[in-house]
Amino acid sequence: MNDEMNSLKKNNTWELCQLPKGKKALQNRWVYRVKEESDGKKRYKARLVVKGFQQRYGIDFTDVFTPVVKLTTIRLVLSMVAAENLELQQMDVKTAFLHGDLEEEIYMVQPEGYNGDDQQVCRLKKSLYGLKQAPRQWYRKFDNFMLEIGFSRCNADHCCYVKRFDEFFIILLLYG
């Protein structure tokens, strides 16, 4: 839990404040998991999850759509890799959903184990797991980053990005 709390603090995920009149604070809970590493060692993980089912449409969220890469795009890229003997890599973005900036005004009760003023709540600045808009906000952050570093988004598939260089190119597929 300490690692997760430190990560949330470092990410500036929320700020403490008084709950404004007429607003409701979402509940949360800790989800615990045992993860086995490639070397066989067990690692214990804790993740703070907002109870997003308590969110109200039009108040806590409006749009939840986020694109996913098309299966035909995946097949096309894999066939290009096989036919041209290209290099293929797979990567994972750790705590991906926690990077999305929130546009809505969302409040959450303080998580168990957090040492803040008991009379205050957390005003979320960044997405947390469980929020209905978390995937959308992550995609927006990722899309902006890819465009800033010179990738082009494919018109036919908004989860396919391409960057060309003199002698080579990079195709990146975002798979949720």
Specify the residue positions occupied by each region the protein language model found.
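Long, low-complexity, charge-biased intrinsically disordered regions
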Residues: 1-176
